[in-house]
UniProtKB/Swiss-Prot annotation:
This is Enolase. NCBIfam families: eno (TIGR01060). The gene is eno. It is found in: Cytoplasm; Secreted; Cell surface. Keywords: Cytoplasm, Glycolysis, Lyase, Magnesium, Metal-binding, Secreted.
């Protein structure tokens, strides 16, 4: 029986020591599911709203007791008796109870915790792993990890403007091999940093955050690490950037101010900056290359570089079908970053991924800076055939938990498992 019998919620801590919401959904037949929601550091202006208490005397105002109370007092009474296997109905009922476009009344953190826990409970009731329950019998593609091994921007207190520098093991033959490659490059990078007396502490997402004089220095270090680890850049491993351009966009002057480098660009100048980097390094993906509302700049970027690399909209699309629809209609970007807490329900997440795939856009399942041990996104990456996942570096248990879950899934699938590899990157297929 998949009828919801009880819903519980509690305040737990995320990987940055901030409170977040965890929910448990229990079913009449004895099955149960538990899920905890993540939280972002650089958040898009158009994201669903996570409800915080604002009490400065408790967790510096970041408590989530209001959201927990909304789960127990508002969502639970309305959902008890409903069928957890009807994900759409469960999510739709919560959206009706909230009644706002941004989920600001009850909190996206309250709604998402229940949405994910309900799916887990239904999967448990059916005796299926979450990826199989959500994705069906065809769910067998393991994603390429975009491993954030060097941090800047909002993820680090340094002069590096670009938020994430990632290694992409697209040339591997399996997820396990790709993960190993990324981990070995990560360790090689640490050795290089130590040799140059640069910081080897890790940031929120497990990547190193050395204070470098310029963004290109980070790329040079990673290329050196790839070489020292014994791999070939541009054949086995590639590079990806999350620029998070909204973070250094000046709305008044409409200029992009790279403070670390002491330079500023208009959108045309910035895309030429990217073009230059892509000609010198094997960059196959750039995320948030323009600010979230600079649609004109995004269009220029897509027209100029869209045929040669993946251009991912994170703050641009915020996992929202309305913003994604505008992007598809105008030919803006060619990929969507998928963050479940940007939109707030699994149903809306599924809708965004399906819309993207129908339009020929790729999708990248993603973590947030503030994570927990919850591994839902690992299962969703396989279930939704995303082909790519961003879940940090090869350190910090909150990041490695997702990688380990993907290793389990690959092992469980056995010979049926397929690694997305180079097939998911349009530019690499064109070079064949």
């Amino acid at each position: 029986m998949t009828e919801i019998s009880q819903i519980l919620a509690r305040e737990v801590l995320d990987s940055r020591g901030n409170p977040t919401v965890e929910a448990e959904v229990q079913l009449a037949g004895g099955a149960r599911g538990r899920a905890a929601v993540p939280s972002g550091a650089s958040t898009g202006e158009h994201e669903a709203i996570e409800l915080r208490d604002g009490d400065k005397h408790r967790y510096l105002g970041k408590g989530v007791q209001k959201a927990v109370k909304n789960v127990v007092d508002v969502l639970a009474p309305a959902l008890v008796g409903m069928d957890a296997a009807d994900q759409f109905a469960v999510d739709q009922r919560m959206l009706e109870l909230d009644g706002t476009a941004t989920k600001g009344k009850l909190g996206a953190n309250a709604i998402l915790a229940v949405s994910m826990a309900a799916a887990r409970a239904a999967a448990d009731a059916h005796g299926l792993p979450l990826y199989r329950y959500v994705g069906g019998v065809q769910a067998r593609t393991l994603p390429v990890p975009l491993m954030n091994i060097l941090n800047g921007g909002a993820h680090a207190d340094t002069r590096v403007d670009v938020q994430e520098f990632m290694v992409v093991p697209a040339g591997a033959s399996s997820f396990a091999e790709g993960l190993r490659w990324g981990a070995e490059v990560f360790h090689a990078l640490k050795k290089i940093l130590k040799g140059r007396k640069l910081a080897t502490g890790v940031g929120d997402e497990g990547g190193y955050a050395p204070d470098l004089p310029a963004n290109e220095e980070a790329l040079k270090l990673i290329m050196e690490a790839i070489d020292q680890a014994g791999f070939k850049a541009g054949e086995q491993l590639f590079l990806a950037l999350d620029v998070a351009a909204s973070e250094f966009f000046d709305k008044g002057s409409k200029k992009y101010k790279l403070k670390g480098e002491g330079k500023e660009y208009d959108s045309t100048g910035l895309l030429e900056y990217y073009r230059g980097l892509s000609e010198r390094y094997p960059i196959i993906s750039i995320e948030d290359g323009m600010a979230e509302d600079d649609w004109e700049g995004w269009k220029k970027l897509t027209d100029a570089l869209g045929s040669r690399m993946q251009l991912v909209g994170d703050d641009l699309f915020v996992t929202n079908v309305e913003r994604l629809g505008r992007g598809i209609e105008t030919g803006t970007a060619n990929s969507i970053l998928v963050k479940v807490n940007q939109i707030g329900t699994l149903t809306e997440t599924f809708d965004a991924v399906r819309m993207a795939h129908r339009a020929g856009y790729t999708s990248v399942m993603s973590h947030r800076s503030g994570e927990t041990e919850d591994t839902t996104i690992a299962d969703l990456a396989v279930a939704l055939d995303c082909g790519q996942i961003k879940t940090g570096s090869a350190s910090r248990s909150d990041r490695v938990a997702k990688y380990n879950q993907l290793l389990r899934i690959e092992g469980e699938l056995g010979a049926a498992a397929r690694y997305a590899g180079k097939s998911v990157f349009r530019a690499l297929n064109q070079k064949k």
